[in-house]
Amino acid sequence: AAGVGLIVTEGTYVGHDSAGESNRVPRFHGEEQLAGWAKVAADVHAAGGTIVPQLWHIGMTRTPGKGPVPDAPVVGPSGLRPGADEPTGVTMTQRDLDDVIGAFAEAAAAAERIGFDGVEIHGAHGYLVDQFLWSGTNRRSDAYGGDLVARTKFAAEIVAAVRETISPEFPIIFRYSQWKQEAYDARLAETPEELEAILSPLAAAGVDAFHASTRRYWLPEFEDSDLNLAGWTKKLTGKQAITVGSVGLDGDFIKGFMGEGSPLRGIDDLLDRLEREEYDLVAVGRALLQDPEWAAKVLAGRTDELKAYDAEALRSLS
């Protein structure tokens, strides 16, 4: 596996009609799709690697009329797209919530059954689970809206349902972020205390590791501390934490989607923080797409051989 300890797949749609909008994004439900995923897991294991699927529902970011089920409604906690003031979608009912929770649980059970090594729940970047966590998209007045803990209820129920469905030793990773695709300056938590209020129910529900998504891993998350979001996550929960955000590169990843490359950025600080056990794992995206030997080179101390990112590396996947 060229030094890569764990592969997290791209986002994969769970089995809910409103989960996605692109027919080019893989689904993690259905006999044919799961047979294909079983082969992926087997091939990764044959190469000496481990792999988890990232389970995903995009919620209010979906475009009406698109996706595997075009007629399905666009749903969210309050029918609000991230960054919007007026609802354009459907506010989810209790039945809707239960259906989505069940879809995540069924996908996780399938992942274990067909040979994956764990699951990651996508709760970041302004998609459905994150839409419940963020006050900008969650205006509910029932048990799923209001204060920080109430806004975490839906995510915690997904985690609990997944945990109940899979074996106790099968790991659950929960990915979350402050920023959103439509709002880089959005924040779930302004203080460590607020972050703890969000993460504690998730940890109690069964999360084994948190994937703390930032755009630039080296930036401190709160005042008066150098800890980044992953560092605070580990400190507050005691759970394993994954850091991510422009690892090894100086350019923003969103610009990479727009066809821009990125120069290299040194990783001495990254490795120092890892050695101090501020976090436990490092997620690498564009740098690894550019150079599949990235992890092996870093582990061998051959950082002088690392390559700058060229957007052609992303286009090669399509």
Predicted feature residues:
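Flavin-dependent oxidoreductase catalytic cores
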Residues: A1-S318
